[in-house]
Amino acid sequence: MKSRLHPSLWFKRYARDQEGATAIEFAIVGPLFLSLLFSSIEMGWVMTQSMMLESAVNRTARSMQINSAAFSAVDFKRTVCSHAIVLKNCEEILNVELSPVDVRGDIPTDATRCVDRAAKTVPLTQFKPGNGNQIVFGRACAVVDVLTPGLGVALSLPVDSSGGLRLTARFAFVSEAI
């Protein structure tokens, strides 16, 4: 014959039972820990892409500073993309702008124009390398995908209509007189 426990005794026995305690703890703490882990990976990847873009643009600008006549917009993008190896489809996602500056107030103050992946258009920008001994200001923008779009820090990143994150780099140099 099966003995029935009084409900209060059954509850006391159930409350003292330790089986499954770690599963409940993991269900509470696990998502927070995983979100922190993926956010750290996301920010590391974004920083890597941003630093590679910045470095590639600076290296290309240094080359252009000495030999500006040999560079077109396509050559500039191609050279940047050869240095920025972590950017996928670099030539498709990169937009470059280059303009001579006469005085300090001529530096563009508007937002850097980026590729619109949703409309599949590249904005019109000028690419004028400048003459000898002229200050040249340039901007580059690459639109990259986030790794974890619906998780952690990626939720707070400023993304465009296609879900891409805009990475920008700015540079200035004086064209060498040849």
Label the model's feature ranges.
Residues 1-84:
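Alpha-helical assembly-interface signal, strongest on the long, hydrophobic N-terminal helix that forms
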Residues 2-3, 58-178:
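Short, conserved structural patches
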